[in-house]
């Protein structure tokens, strides 16, 4: 937001953004209202909440009766988030807890929120493997449309689809584990990813591929992660 704001202020004509940002609460709503939903709680990403705050989550927690715990990204942060979520489930509670107070406030970052409101506007967004979720994305507002690469370079018609064998959408919704997908670790690896959850190093499939906590697929059997696979995920040099 600040980059395109500065580009407009400076009158730059060689700067463009291809915006694909998403909003978390509408995605949670879509997951929780699906008939096959199995999700019992959420760990809310601390870096998102450091900007957006936590005010959007209490209504979701109450409506769907699930705990929402804001966490950081260090191992202890994540473990603490899981611990707090499990304790809520054990007590039959469903509320928002902030386990990342060193970075997250309820009101978020007011200056950043004002910038977001000026530069972006909310739109419906297609999620790979899931489909279209209303009000779940952002695009540049009319005032900044000249910097929108989708508008400027006429790429709106470009569409990509995941192969039928890829079950990343089900992984994203918590319906299956990565190792339940027949492509996992065979045709789908971090070097040859088929879906969003393997493309990103933060994705569930990429994490399973690296740490290999399950052994119920041919690719997962064995005594550990081969050195070649470790090098794929952790390149040196």
Q: Residue spans of the language-model regions?
A:
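Phosphate/pyrophosphate-binding betaalpha-module
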Residues: 1-56
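Predominant activation on well-ordered alpha-helical scaffold segments within soluble catalytic domains
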Residues: 1-5, 28-29, 54-61, 76-87, ...
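Fold-independent oxyanion-binding glycine-rich loops
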Residues: 3, 20-22, 45-48, 72-73, ...
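Solvent-exposed alpha-helices and their adjacent loops that cap or buttress functional pockets
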Residues: 7-12, 31-41, 59-63, 158-160, ...
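A conserved active-site cap/scaffold subdomain adjacent to cofactor or substrate pockets
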Residues: 18, 38-101
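Internal helical hairpin/lid segments
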Residues: 80-170
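Extended hydrophobic packing segments that form well-structured cores
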Residues: 152-222, 231-237
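Detector for the Zn2+-coordinating histidines of canonical Cys2His2
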Residues: 227
